[in-house]
Swiss-Prot record:
Protein name: Probable GTP-binding protein EngB
GO terms classed as biological process: division septum assembly
Residues that bind Mg(2+): 53, 75
Cofactor(s) this protein requires: Mg(2+)
Pfam family, one: MMR_HSR1
Classification of source organism: Bacteria, Pseudomonadati, Pseudomonadota, Alphaproteobacteria, Rickettsiales
Ligand binding (GTP): 46-53, 73-77, 91-94, 158-161, 189-191
Function, in words: Necessary for normal cell division and for the maintenance of normal septation.
Amino acid sequence: MTTQKIVPTKSTDGSKLFRHQAKFVAGAMNINQIPNFSLPEIAFVGKSNVGKSSLINTICSNKNLAKVSNTPGRTRQINFFNLADKLIIVDLPGYGFANVPISVKEQWGVLISYYLRNSYNLRLVNLLIDSRRGIKENDKKVADLLLANKREFQIIFTKSDKVTDHKNLHDEAQNFLATLNYSCNVMYVSNRSKEGARELKASLAKCIKPQK
């Protein structure tokens, strides 16, 4: 099994789309608050402090768009950002953070699971993995949930500037995908060096509805 490789072209690299300014449009702390924008949605999910909000800020060229904190568990609701009325970017709460009450963790779990299972407009899920930590059990559970609900996803290794050799990560991803019998993009991104930002934008731009 091989991962797909995105080769951005002038028409698909996402530069035109991400030239527009994204804006925060809604936050949902429970399932009843989840909005329906009737636009394609792409979601970012991963462990707490994996860099979801920072990555959204990087690809949108706005360091103040999604709130960023060095404290794990800061994102406590689903945040929705509108990009040019063409795409909704969804920042999900992180999972696996221990230093919150069990009731809060359960609430986040219900919220994340419900959104991933039920969002009608969800087109692509970006499963973020910390390059320094590798794929953990919680990540595998999320991947299982996505496959069970026929959700398309791609693996994004964050903080790639913190590791010197991507081969071990590549092999780990390949073995993981083989166990799932699934093939998808595997990317390496760094908010500091901007590595992988162009390829990621290209994959997201493909989720836009075609012009009629």
